[in-house]
């Protein structure tokens, strides 16, 4: 009888459970979520991996829980003791859990705060990244100090602690821990190479390469300036100067493209004052729908593309705040809210924004990170779309994510 189905893909937290299935020779089918998309979405609305379905429809999520469950499925008692700790050795069991937790939470969280922005997957803020790197250094010191004196993290053999921690360290070795760093941390490097060569993980490292140098901060794209017209050969230098000055003056303050649409009958500032000073659901929203002109303004659902990389909710809210700050050149043509829903390490960003005109690009592309979001036009004559807008601006109802309600925990208003 089959022992179940494991959903796993390229994500680092799926490496260990997939490796356990192979090394322990479990009768567990391993499939990617994309290969069974409809079934996966029905069984696991959050669409997080790894995920496991056992006999009689038993469902399990979260990597540490799945790893434990898979080891317990093994008939090899010696291997179960090695990976989980002996039943009568409480200290070893606790240490195995401790090191797993440190890697799977504290260390893994910092991937989103260091590697992701350095790769351009999130806005880069030097102060934030430097602070996150300091946190990584402190965690690394804990590992290095342990491994200077011991072969493995928790016991005298490879345990789940080593497998989980090594898999998380992989992303750092690929991106941040270059040749110089590795020379300064020989104990971690020795341990990492030992664990990744084990039967549990060796197949995952076929294409692995150590980084030579750490990732560099992303470079801001410089706008190309139009070449200045060459002065006529017969003109004197003094005569050419006024023309150049005039060109420079006219290019200093380019008009916002939305200014070309002219003045609207819907007074945006009146709406912003109404929203700020009145109760949202009973007073402000009815006023909005009474005065809103769909020919002058369009409404858009804005969704962050990388919700699966978000960690702490306050950091997600800071991400929204930074995005809104970078939209400052367009705020006189916009209004909206982005909210953070869910909980730490399982949250997302979504919202509704109104912009002048029928195209979202001229309003949003003033922010360097505008392409980190998806934009879908909303139809205010559609009851579902209208209710979504009301909910995003009122913040008083849960967000529906794949049919599951998620409480709003924070948010920002663009006004």
From Swiss-Prot:
Compartments (UniProt record): Cytoplasm; Nucleus
UniProt keyword list: Acetylation, Cytoplasm, Elongation factor, Nucleus, Phosphoprotein, Protein biosynthesis
Any Pfam family hit: EF1G
GO function term, MF aspect, one: calcium ion binding
Domain EF-1-gamma C-terminal: 254-415
Domain GST C-terminal, first and last residues per copy: 89-215
Highest taxon of source: Eukaryota
Major subcellular site: cytoplasm
Chain residue ranges for the region called Disordered: 212-256
Residues modified as Phosphothreonine: 32
A GO CC term assigned to this protein in UniProt: cytoplasm
Protein's GO biological process: positive regulation of transcription by RNA polymerase II; regulation of translational termination; translational elongation
Note: Present with 60865 molecules/cell in log phase SD medium.
Domain notes: Ths GST-like domain mediates the interaction to eEFB1 and may be responsible for dimerization of the eEF1 complex.
The protein's assembly and partners: The eukaryotic elongation factor 1 complex (eEF1) is probably a heterohexamer. Two trimeric complexes, each composed of eEF1A (TEF1 or TEF2), eEF1Balpha (EFB1) and eEF1Bgamma (CAM1 or TEF4), are probably dimerized via the eF1Bgamma subunits. The eEF1B subcomplex with the GEF activity is formed of eEF1Balpha and eEF1Bgamma. CAM1 interacts with EFB1. Component of a complex bound to MXR1 promoter region.
Role this protein plays: Subunit of the eukaryotic elongation factor 1 complex (eEF1). Probably plays a role in anchoring the complex to other cellular components. May be involved in transcriptional regulation of MXR1.
Entry protein name: Elongation factor 1-gamma 1
Highest classification ranks of the organism: Eukaryota, Fungi, Dikarya, Ascomycota, Saccharomycotina
Gene name of this polypeptide: CAM1
